[in-house]
């Protein structure tokens, strides 16, 4: 989580998917298998933990029930935000959770606007390097989120 131009908190959790299904191609990308997530919490529990962390960072003086609306007004940043937002909407639907109209900012779009054709591609690790960030463990959720934060702070 970023506040006043600084990363002030981070959060990582594996999530047991619903249904407990693992796509071969997805496993090849991120290396997560069923064995890794057998004891992991489901999305709704992880999202609740994340809301509590966001509340501590941004709204520590208020009750959680009072700030769910305010959490929804915070900007969310992703590299290829259309994909990530689509995944988030889908999982909210699976768990029958209300999806607020989150405001996403896209570092992929910002990269294309800033760097144009000066980069060989606009993949996360390429853009991170162009912004002076050394992305280690690409496709690990926390590592990718930290790289995305660095790109956002550089470009947005």
For each predicted feature, which ranges?
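Conserved non-catalytic scaffold segment of RNase H-like nuclease domains
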Residues: 1-89, 101, 121, 125, ...
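Acidic, divalent-metal-coordinating active-site segment for phosphoryl/phosphodiester hydrolysis
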Residues: 83, 140-153
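Conserved hydrophobic residues forming the short capping helix/wall of the S-adenosyl-L-methionine
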Residues: 92
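Short hydrophobic/aromatic-enriched beta-strand-loop microsegments
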Residues: 98-105
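Short alpha-helix plus adjacent loop in nuclease-associated cores
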Residues: 105-121
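Acidic two-metal-ion nuclease catalytic site recognized across multiple nuclease folds
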Residues: 128-130, 149-156
């Amino acid at each position: 989580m970023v506040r006043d131009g600084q990363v002030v908190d981070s959060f990582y959790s594996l999530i047991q998917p619903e249904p407990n299904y693992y796509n071969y191609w997805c496993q090849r990308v991120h290396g997560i298998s069923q064995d890794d997530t057998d004891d992991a919490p489901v999305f709704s529990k992880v999202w609740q933990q994340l809301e509590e962390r966001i509340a501590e960072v941004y709204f520590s003086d208020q009750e959680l029930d009072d700030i769910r609306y305010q959490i929804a007004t915070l900007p969310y940043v992703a590299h290829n935000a259309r994909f990530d937002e689509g995944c988030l909407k889908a999982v909210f639907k699976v768990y029958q959770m209300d999806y607020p109209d989150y405001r996403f900012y896209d570092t992929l779009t910002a990269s294309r606007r800033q760097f144009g054709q000066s980069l060989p591609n606009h993949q996360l690790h390429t853009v991170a390097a162009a912004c002076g960030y050394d992305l280690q463990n690409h496709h690990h959720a926390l590592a990718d989120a930290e790289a995305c934060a660095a790109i956002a702070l550089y470009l947005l």
